UniProtKB/Swiss-Prot annotation:
It catalyses: reduced [plastocyanin] + hnu + oxidized [2Fe-2S]-[ferredoxin] = oxidized [plastocyanin] + reduced [2Fe-2S]-[ferredoxin]. PROSITE patterns: PHOTOSYSTEM_I_PSAAB (PS00419). PsaA and PsaB bind P700, the primary electron donor of photosystem I (PSI), as well as the electron acceptors A0, A1 and FX. PSI is a plastocyanin-ferredoxin oxidoreductase, converting photonic excitation into a charge separation, which transfers an electron from the donor P700 chlorophyll pair to the spectroscopically characterized acceptors A0, A1, FX, FA and FB in turn. Oxidized P700 is reduced on the lumenal side of the thylakoid membrane by plastocyanin. It comes from Arabidopsis thaliana (Mouse-ear cress). This is Photosystem I P700 chlorophyll a apoprotein A1. The chain crosses the membrane at residues 70-93, 156-179, 195-219, 291-309, 346-369, 385-411, 433-455, 531-549, 589-610, 664-686, 724-744. GO terms for cellular component: chloroplast; chloroplast envelope; chloroplast thylakoid; chloroplast thylakoid membrane; photosystem I; plastid; plastoglobule; thylakoid. Belongs to the PsaA/PsaB family. Keywords: 4Fe-4S, Chlorophyll, Chloroplast, Chromophore, Electron transport, Iron, Iron-sulfur, Magnesium, Membrane, Metal-binding, Oxidoreductase, Photosynthesis, Photosystem I, Plastid, Thylakoid, Transmembrane, Transmembrane helix, Transport.
Length: 750
């Protein structure tokens, strides 16, 4: 008998060569579906092809295969992102005035696109200063490049090439992990290992390496730039890394190396890891030493967080245990069963992630202007407005996406048999109470918020300003918001040792910061006007939530259609025999939710744009007198609907409407074109399918008469296709119109 030592158990987590690589198959449209692969009978085929190409649930019901497809697609997505980034850096290297901007960021505008003269397009190349003619960019790339220590266009070239290499690598990884070594389902469901890698690896080591880059490269280079040293004279990044004496000249404690760290004498590092608060008066951005400190702290937190969960060693938390331990006195089974949901339904997982990421994106929008992180960002008003608007729209779309995937989870992945009395079941059982209360809140907010405006418009029209809600008549001060502002303004010196200013100048208390005669930031006053528009925000957000939440909670069943789950995620009506059952699918709720999301975000960006032009942005004279772009008219003008129309939309549209013949004329054309795209959507939203089918049939008759009828039968768009085309053009047209309006205005006056 041979005694063997037990073999160590190694889990095999991948399948080798599971699916052969076949270009013939890829070249066949609809290869993922037996029906679509047959080819087109009617024009509906092309719609189904697009609708189902990425709906992996419809290709197979095998969770492992779905997981692999999603995983592989993520690498494709990353590849596109790297390609896009490479393009941005390449434009910076090849077509931009980055080096000129770097030497004088207050007088030279950022430009990274020069239009070729074909039939007069060169009119678009405006004078951005320093003798450079090009299109002014508003993406903030120049500011982030300066903050990271890029001093030449050669460095941008190298980064662009590096990004292309990574794009190729990602494409390869996507192919490799689907066709050559595809992970097993168990790998996708190993949440503790995933948390370990994402928290400690991605966020922890990612933040740590960025903090290291900031300390060793960004800080010294920015120190030189702020002192007015010519970028060409500044040592290159690798010289700072390899030569400690260079850094020690700027930060003497560098000479001591890591000794203070191991002897716990950390205060030695306070030269370059600071906790100041406020803005750097030279650049109008956050102190880069504060930012480096922040990333170091974040890195420590996430490195610890990444080691809290139980993986191969039997210590640490298990997510399943944590969830099942969450039981309150009134919550029945509590979170029991949520673990199974989140590891078997990627829609449920995605829904949570989208809700979190969407909220985070909106938080980013609000911090980019109140705590501008990059040098010379705060005085670049066009970029500030663009970044705010961009992050608000993205956040809105992500949150609607969260509701969409929550509803898909409810329809496709929810299994009522093993859900009893846990939190989700309890929410579903009192959904009527939730939705009816939410409905009441929406009615209350709608009537009261608009009622205040209508009152003001009426009093204004009757010439009774003393009876209006305003800062000079009947005041409705946002006292709670002002209290929060005050608390933050008084916080420095009380909360953190050595903190000299509050987190943001907007809280109040501090002086204003101006760079090159332009206001970077100052305390933002809040008054009656903000109180009114704030309640419009509350109203539009609650209506959006009402629509989306109703779609999720009634996705499987309702009193009207008890068997809704059998009809799927999107369906036009419940059969011909039941009137009044159209537009009730979960998909239709997402469709309607998108319009209200558009309403909500529009009011937010209008509020921001006008408020900043009126109360923050402007120029400052040698005597210290601030002249705001619209002269502080927000408080008195925005308290009536007429004021919004006259003093915001109409008054500020003059730049885009009069842009023809100037370098801003493209915005004028976009403004016009995007209005057309928006109007085009109404044709799809306000018409019936039957009307178009009749029209198509008479056109087909004419084609048959002339013997030019195609083999593929034309079909009118289905009800759902029509609504999809409608909402797409509505949003695209509306967003592009707003974009052109904002940018023509702010580039002209900012």
């Amino acid at each position: 008998m041979i005694i063997r030592s037990p073999e160590p158990e190694v889990k095999i987590l991948v399948d080798r060569d599971p699916i052969k690589t076949s270009f013939e198959e890829w070249a066949k449209p609809g290869h993922f579906s037996r029906t679509i692969a047959k080819g087109p009978d009617t024009t509906t085929w092309i719609w189904n092809l697009h609708a189902d190409a990425h709906d992996f649930d419809s290709h197979t019901s095998d969770l492992e295969e779905i997981s692999r497809k999603v995983f592989s697609a993520h690498f494709g997505q990353l590849s596109i992102i790297f390609l896009w980034l490479s393009g941005m850096y390449f434009h910076g290297a090849r077509f931009s005035n980055y080096e000129a901007w770097l030497s004088d960021p207050t007088h030279i505008g950022p430009s990274a696109q020069v239009v070729w003269p074909i039939v007069g397009q060169e009119i678009l190349n405006g004078d951005v200063g320093g003798g450079f003619r090009g299109i002014q960019i508003t993406s903030g790339f120049f500011q982030i490049w300066r903050a990271s220590g890029i001093t030449s266009e050669l460095q941008l070239y190298c980064t662009a090439i590096g990004a292309l290499v990574f794009a190729a690598l990602m494409l390869f990884a996507g192919w490799f992990h689907y066709h050559k070594a595809a992970p097993k389902l168990a790998w996708f469901q190993d949440v503790e290992s995933m948390l370990n890698h994402h928290l400690a690896g991605l966020l922890g080591l990612g933040s740590l390496s960025w903090a290291g880059h900031q300390v060793h490269v960004s800080l010294p280079i920015n120190q030189f730039l702020n002192a007015g040293v010519d970028p060409k004279e500044i040592p290159l990044p690798h010289e700072f890394i390899l030569n400690r004496d260079l850094l020690a000249q700027l930060y003497p404690s560098f000479a001591e190396g890591a000794t203070p760290f191991f002897t716990l004498n950390w205060s030695k590092y306070s030269e370059f890891l600071t906790f100041r608060g406020g803005l750097d008066p030279v650049t109008g951005g956050l102190w880069l030493t504060d930012i480096a400190h922040h990333h170091l702290a974040i890195a420590i937190l996430f490195l610890i967080a990444g080691h809290m969960y139980r993986t191969n060693w039997g210590i640490g938390h298990g997510i399943k245990d944590i969830l099942e331990a969450h039981k309150g006195p009134f919550t029945g089974q509590g979170h029991k069963g949520l673990y199974e949901i989140l590891t078997t339904s990627w829609h449920a997982q995605l829904s949570l992630n989208l809700a979190m990421l969407g909220s985070l994106t909106i938080i980013v929008a609000h911090h980019m202007y109140s705590m501008p992180p990059y040098p010379y960002l705060a005085t670049d008003y066009a970029t500030q407005l663009s970044l705010f608007t961009h992050h608000m729209w993205i956040g809105g779309f992500l949150i609607v996406g969260a509701a969409a995937h929550a509803a898909i989870f409810m329809v496709r992945d929810y299994d009522p048999t093993n859900r009893y009395n846990d939190l989700l079941d309890r929410v579903l059982r009192h959904r009527d109470a939730i939705i009816s209360h939410l409905n009441w809140v929406c009615i209350f907010l709608g009537f009261h918020s608009f009622g205040l405006y209508i009152h003001n418009d009426t009093m204004s029209a009757l010439g009774r300003p003393q009876d209006m809600f305003s800062d000079t008549a009947i005041q409705l001060q946002p006292v709670f918001a002002q209290w929060i502002q005050n608390t933050h303004a008084l916080a420095p010196g009380v909360t953190a040792p050595g903190e000299t200013a509050s987190t943001s100048l907007t809280w109040g208390g501090g002086e204003l910061v101006a760079v090159g005669g332009k206001v970077a930031l100052l305390p933002i006053p809040l008054g009656t006007a903000d109180f009114l528009v704030h309640h419009i925000h509350a109203f539009t957000i609650h209506v959006t939530v009402l629509i989306l939440l109703k779609g999720v909670l009634f996705a499987r069943s309702s009193r009207l259609i008890p068997d809704k789950a059998n009809l799927g995620f999107r369906f036009p009506c419940d059969g011909p025999g039941r009137g009044g059952t159209c537009q009730v699918s979960a998909w239709d709720h997402v469709f309607l939710g998108l319009f209200w999301m558009y309403n909500a975000i529009s009011v937010v960006i209008f509020h921001f744009s006008w408020k900043m032009q009126s109360d923050v942005w402007g120029s400052i004279s040698d005597q210290g007198v601030v002249t705001h772009i619209t002269g502080g008219n927000f408080a008195q003008s925005s308290i009536t609907i007429n004021g919004w129309l006259r003093d915001f939309l109409w008054a500020q549209a003059s730049q885009v409407i009069q842009s023809y013949g100037s370098s801003l004329s493209a915005y004028g054309l976009f403004f016009l074109g995007a209005h057309f795209v928006w109007a085009f959507s109404l044709m799809f939203l306000f018409s019936g399918r039957g009307y178009w089918q009749e029209l198509i049939e008479s056109i087909v008759w004419a084609h048959n008469k002339l013997k030019v009828a195609p083999a593929t039968q034309p079909r009118a768009l289905s009800i759902i296709q029509g609504r999809a085309v409608g909402v797409t053009h509505y949003l695209l047209g509306g967003i592009a119109t707003t974009w052109a309006f904002f940018l023509a205005r702010i580039i002209a006056v900012g």
